[in-house]
Regions:
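Extracytoplasmic beta-rich repeat domains
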Residues: 145-158, 189-210, 238-260, 270-275, ...
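Short loop/turn segments immediately following the C-termini of beta-strands
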Residues: 121-124, 169-171, 221, 270-272, ...
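Short loop/turn segments that connect beta-strands within beta-propeller blades
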Residues: 180-183, 229-232, 281-284, 324-328, ...
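Loop/turn-rich, solvent-exposed surfaces of beta-rich toroidal or solenoidal domains
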Residues: 363-365, 387-453
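Blade-level signature of beta-propeller repeat domains, shared across WD40, Kelch, NHL, RCC1
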Residues: 363-365, 470-499
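Aromatic (tryptophan-biased) beta-strands that constitute blades/sheets of beta-rich domains
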Residues: 4-7, 11, 20-149, 175-177, ...
Length: 499
């Protein structure tokens, strides 16, 4: 019986390989894994073809566009450390820190302000609170104000002072790029030799850059961490967090967005022997501290306050952890083992002392409650079930209800009880944000959908196609502009209510 099953499995595998070869040879199609691990035929360019297409577009863009008043100087370093002194500032030169890391200059509600400065927004919770947006989308959809080719990778955008920043794979280089939000024009790039190739997940960098106080902190898939000048992309300092920590890379690459905590940039290299979480000086790149020995995961750290205690909350491969903001003490933990350590979504703060967490691969979801006990915080499980399984699309919270993708189907769950309110609509393994009581869903197939955030029923208001190819990247919004991208394209929409 076992021998027969093995023969059948081998035959199926051989058949899949033959099918893949035929599709590629005669139709130019390749089998690409979707978020559920199912192979799907798609048109996929080679890395060289994609890089050449992006460069042709950018060259034509430069030739046709008049100069912008903001700097548009390209800066490219080889990774050897050359030219790292350019633009270095001392800590005394930095502006006084704002209470909210997302605070910047410019009029409130304008893209000139520094608002969407972190992965999934200023609070990393996927909610847009800057002001009203247009939510009267026609059923036929919206027209992008610009759309253009992009390099590979799963990073999102951050947006500050009329610029959108992201990181892409272009040929054999990882490239941080700055774009003018209104026109899509590329303002500068900073590139270094690095290639992350992964047949199931896809190629390119995963971690979204972080903007703070005129600097961009970008992490590549192979551990390269750079502080860049927002105006021209010049390197202020650089390091490799994997080399620094003696850590090996994760199977799907470094994915955690750098986190600003006071004067520090906190990252998750996952090294052994107190090297798992590390902090670097924002101004100089000097290593400040490191702690813990967990293997890391694919979620980004968050700076939150629970029970009046500021803390860094993050997923490792096997647990959710609360760490003191200075890295000196583990405050609490909640075991959360997942197949292959794939914790890839963001926890959500639910009130003063509760957190929602979820993972896919059968793990499900839970709400935990923290209480003070002496000098440590204790954890109580409020509820846990499998009604919400976020594989790598994080949920959002609206008026006591959690909205998210239960694997590939949208669902609503009561945050207090875990009760399923509804489940409906198929969006693949896409991403979603909360805006003015609506859910903006970017589907795995590249559609944009607008869904009413209500516990009553699944109510999709509009849906239309935007991007071609597998789409796992989180959308970004600032100043009324919605930006989306995937492994091959990027686009922008004007959702301002007044213009």
């Amino acid at each position: 019986m076992l021998r027969t099953l093995l023969k059948i499995a081998a035959g199926l595998m051989l058949g899949a390989l033959v099918t893949a070869g035929v599709l590629y040879q005669f139709l130019g199609l390749r089998l690409v894994m979707d978020g559920g691990g199912i192979p799907r035929p798609m048109f996929v360019e080679s890395a060289a073809e994609q890089a050449a297409r992006v460069e042709r577009h950018r060259a034509a863009q430069r030739a046709q566009s008049p100069p912008l008043p903001s700097p548009a100087t390209a800066a490219s370093e080889t990774g050897s450390g050359a030219g790292l002194e350019a633009g270095v500032q001392t800590r005394a030169d930095l502006e006084t820190l704002a209470t909210d890391p997302g605070t910047g200059t410019g009029a409130p509600g304008s893209v000139a302000a520094a608002y969407w400065t972190d992965f999934r927004g200023p609070n990393r919770d996927g909610e847009y609170r800057e002001g009203p947006l247009r939510v009267d989308w026609p059923a036929s959809g919206l027209t992008p104000i610009w759309k253009q080719p992009a390099g590979a990778g799963y990073a999102s955008f951050v947006i500050a002072r009329n610029r959108a920043f992201t990181i892409e794979q272009r040929g054999s280089n990882e490239v941080v790029a700055a774009y003018d939000v209104a026109s899509g024009r590329e303002l500068w790039t900073n590139a270094w030799p690095a290639e992350f190739r992964e047949s199931m997940g896809g190629d390119g960098p995963r971690a979204t850059p972080t903007w703070f106080d005129g600097r961009l902190f970008a992490l590549g898939a192979t551990g390269e961490l750079r502080a860049l000048d927002e105006g021209n992309g010049k390197v202020i300092w650089r390091t490799n967090i994997l080399s620094d920590s003696g850590a090996g890379n994760l199977p799907w690459g470094m994915a955690a967005a750098p986190l600003v905590v006071g004067d520090a940039i906190v990252v998750l290299p996952g090294g052994p022997a107190n090297q798992s979480v590390a902090a670097y000086d924002r101004a100089t790149g000097k290593r400040l501290w490191s702690t813990m020995g967990d293997m890391q995961a694919y979620s980004s750290p968050m700076l939150v306050t629970l029970l009046g205690v500021p803390q860094i909350v993050f997923f490792s491969s096997s647990r959710l952890v609360g760490l003191s903001a200075d890295g000196s003490k583990e405050l609490w933990e909640y075991p959360w083992p997942v197949m292959n350590g794939i914790n890839a979504t963001q926890p959500i703060v639910v009130g003063d002392n509760r957190l929602f967490l979820s993972s896919g691969y059968g793990a499900g979801a839970a709400v935990i409650e923290l209480s003070k006990a002496s000098d440590r915080l204790t954890v109580r499980e409020v509820w846990r079930n499998t009604r919400m399984k976020n594989r790598f699309a994080s949920s959002v919270l609206h008026e006591g209800v959690i909205y998210g993708l239960d694997e590939s189907i949208l669902a609503a769950v009561d945050a207090n009880t875990g009760e399923l309110k509804w489940k409906g609509g198929r969006y693949g393994y896409g991403q979603l944000l909360l805006v003015n009581g609506r859910l903006i869903v970017l589907t795995e197939d590249g559609d944009l959908a607008l869904v009413r955030a209500t516990p009553e029923k699944h109510d999709e208001l509009s849906r239309f196609h935007v991007l071609d190819g597998k789409t796992w990247n989180v959308p970004a919004i600032a100043g009324g502009y919605l930006l989306v991208r995937n492994l091959a394209e990027m686009a922008a929409f004007d959702l301002r209510t007044t213009r």
